């Protein structure tokens, strides 16, 4: 029954893709109109008019990127990988301490090499997690030799790595953490370890909050230190804590920083540099593939009011899932992100309220016949969405025998319902309560759409009860989406926070509580910290049911949100920092001339 149903959907998808191309040709000279409900006037939007700045990354530029870095490097990479893997065997043979192992794992993850050593790391972390925590994870013969500062560093590092890996850290462990704080001396390694560990706290752990305040205060005093290396590390940590950083950006920065260390492991560093370039080359190939798709849709040429943000959307998908083996997930998530951006622009800046209602209901019903009642620009948007999702569904059905289209269509319908609520608020000049706003806004930010598609794209063994399985991870996805929303709203410029414009978290809080913008922003920052705690708890709860790549994808959504909205809206108005970040992780490779 499911196969018969999908064959019909697949046929419709093929037919209506042809319809989309025909419509694009017919509408080559189309001028779009935006209705102003208040005055009943029609404003013409011509192709020469652009609401948003043009893309910095053209299709021709992307198509010309070099992608052949791996040639003649496989043998060297394999040799280095084997040598690094031996370090884990050294630990299991008793040749290195727990502290040395934890520092190795920390370096591997920060250098972007975690995807190569997942099995090795899980095996030894399982062992460490079962060690009597009263020993602080140190071998008995080492305890007398380790200085207090090193013990505190080891304690913090162990806590952070175990918790970020999904292990439950006992209350007894935290009690020892509290007792050890009395021996804090303020050394940089110790302070940084305490600081980074404190950002893995859960609700009801005030001792870690106090440790965060202490370490932050001490680190702030070192920001003007004459030692440039020390100052760089301190400023980097205070900018965004490690657990909240986008993984590829951290890898790029840490490879440079690690290379300046006198104690750097040369083989580990060489592997990190080669691996970064190899992964980057894979990303370039993915980007070229999705760029051809985006060019083929013709949406940018025909809908002159939308943002052309393919590169930024690809950057976003790399932030969510960078590992080379998940190339299909990365490419398809980029398509989803560009469609979300396109449809968001339709709801935000172009469509009339009545037209948006028609579009929303059509998507909720997944009804291709509804296009007959739409204006041309909505037909283009609907058909692009319909064909793309049906094609994804076809690939999953072909490979695994499961029809996921109803699941994907459902989350799209829910997203557009949330879009419509916001459009109605704006149309009616209505300012919702802060609670009502957030209840809708964590859905309208599109995190659930991205994560649901990612779930099916990454999951190689989709079952008939996939939708029920998704519900088990609702909290993880919800808090990741909430962080996405809060970071987005925090990026709003002062002149955008206006009661007469679309509500956001800051304007709603200001209006409801009669407070200043500064007070509202501080409240949102507090909610961000609480949401991270909620998400970490949800991550731990999911560890027993969900594979690590899926959990990581949800956490990475929050991380890339933190990055893209750090200096403003990096999607709406890409500026110099966004361009530099794209260059650093997608375009510009490391120099490997000194690696034999």
UniProtKB/Swiss-Prot annotation:
Keyword Manganese: yes
Protein keywords: Chloroplast, Lyase, Magnesium, Manganese, Metal-binding, Plastid, Transit peptide
UniProt KW Plastid keyword: yes
Classification via Gene3D superfamilies: Farnesyl Diphosphate Synthase, Terpene synthase, N-terminal domain
Catalytic activity: (2E)-geranyl diphosphate = (E)-beta-ocimene + diphosphate
Binding positions for (2E)-geranyl diphosphate per the UniProt entry: 307, 344, 348, 485, 488
Co-factor(s): Mg(2+); Mn(2+)
Transit peptide stretch: 1-35
Cofactor note: Binds 3 Mg(2+) or Mn(2+) ions per subunit.
Residues the record lists as binding Mg(2+) 1: 344, 348
GO cellular component: chloroplast
Database matches in CDD domains: Terpene_cyclase_plant_C1
GO biological process: diterpenoid biosynthetic process
Enzyme Commission code: 4.2.3.106
Chain ranges passing through the membrane: none
Metabolic or biological pathway: Secondary metabolite biosynthesis; terpenoid biosynthesis
Pfam families in alphabetical order: Terpene_synth (PF01397), Terpene_synth_C (PF03936)
Tissue: Highly expressed in leaves, stems and disk florets. Detected in roots.
Protein family (similarity comment): Belongs to the terpene synthase family. Tpsb subfamily.
Database matches in PANTHER family: OS04G0344100 PROTEIN-RELATED, TERPENE SYNTHASE 12-RELATED
Official protein name in the record: (E)-beta-ocimene synthase, chloroplastic
């Amino acid at each position: 029954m499911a196969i018969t149903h999908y064959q019909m959907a697949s046929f419709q998808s093929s037919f209506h893709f042809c319809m989309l191309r025909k419509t694009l040709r017919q509408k080559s000279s189309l001028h779009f109109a935006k209705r102003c409900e208040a005055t009943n006037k029609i404003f013409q939007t011509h192709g020469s008019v652009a609401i948003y700045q043009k893309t910095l990354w053209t299709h021709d530029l992307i198509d010309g990127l070099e992608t052949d870095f791996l040639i003649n490097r496989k043998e060297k990479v394999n040799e280095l990988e084997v040598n690094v893997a031996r370090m884990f065997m050294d630990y299991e043979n008793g040749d290195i301490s727990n502290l040395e192992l934890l520092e190795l794992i920390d370096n591997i993850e920060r250098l972007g090499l975690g995807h190569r050593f997942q099995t090795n790391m899980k095996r030894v972390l399982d062992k460490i997690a079962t060690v009597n925590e009263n020993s602080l994870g140190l071998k008995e013969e080492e305890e007398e030799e380790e200085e207090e500062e090193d013990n505190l560093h080891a304690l913090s590092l162990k806590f952070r790595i175990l918790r970020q890996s999904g292990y439950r850290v006992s209350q007894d462990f935290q009690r020892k953490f509290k007792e050890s704080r009395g021996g804090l001396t303020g050394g940089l390694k110790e302070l940084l370890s305490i600081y980074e560990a404190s950002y893995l706290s859960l609700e009801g752990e005030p001792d870690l909050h106090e440790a965060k305040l202490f370490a932050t205060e001490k680190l702030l005093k070192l920001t003007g230190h004459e030692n440039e290396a020390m100052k760089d590390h301190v400023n980097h940590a205070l900018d965004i804590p490690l657990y909240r950083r986008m993984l590829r950006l951290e890898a790029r920065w840490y490879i440079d920083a690690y290379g300046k260390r006198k104690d750097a492991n040369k083989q580990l560093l060489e592997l990190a540099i080669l691996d970064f370039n190899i992964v980057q080359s894979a990303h370039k190939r993915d980007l070229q593939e999705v760029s051809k798709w985006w060019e083929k849709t013709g949406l940018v040429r025909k809908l002159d009011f939308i943002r052309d943000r393919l590169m930024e959307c690809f950057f976003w998908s790399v932030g969510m899932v960078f590992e080379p083996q998940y190339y299909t997930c990365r490419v398809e998530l980029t398509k989803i992100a560009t469609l979300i951006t396109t449809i968001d622009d339709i709801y935000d800046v172009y469509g009339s309220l009545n037209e948006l209602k028609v579009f929303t209901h059509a998507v909720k019903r997944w009804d291709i016949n509804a296009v007959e009642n739409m204006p041309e620009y909505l037909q283009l948007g609907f058909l692009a969405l319909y064909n793309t999702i049906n094609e994804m569904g076809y690939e999953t059905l072909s490979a695994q025998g499961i029809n996921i289209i109803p699941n994907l269509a459902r989350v799209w319908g829910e997203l557009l319902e949330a879009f419509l609520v916001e459009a109605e608020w704006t149309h009616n000049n209505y300012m919702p309560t802060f609670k009502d706003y957030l209840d809708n806004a964590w859905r309208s930010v599109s995190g659930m759409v991205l994560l649901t598609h990612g779930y099916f794209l990454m999951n190689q063994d989709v079952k008939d009860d996939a939708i029920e399985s998704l519900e088990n991870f609702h909290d993880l996805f919800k808090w990741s989406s909430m962080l996405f929303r809060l970071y987005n709203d925090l990026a709003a410029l002062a002149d955008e926070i206006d009661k007469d414009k679309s509500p956001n978290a800051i304007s709603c809080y200001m209006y409801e509580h009669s407070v200043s913008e500064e007070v509202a922003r501080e409240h949102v920052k507090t909610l961000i910290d609480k949401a991270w705690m909620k998400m970490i708890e949800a991550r731990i709860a999911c560890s027993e049911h969900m594979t690590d790549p899926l959990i990581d994808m949800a956490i990475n959504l929050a991380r890339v949100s933190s990055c893209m909205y750090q200096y403003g809206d990096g999607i709406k108005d890409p500026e110099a920092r966004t361009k530099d970040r794209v260059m650093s992780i997608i375009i510009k490779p490391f120099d490997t001339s000194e690696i034999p």
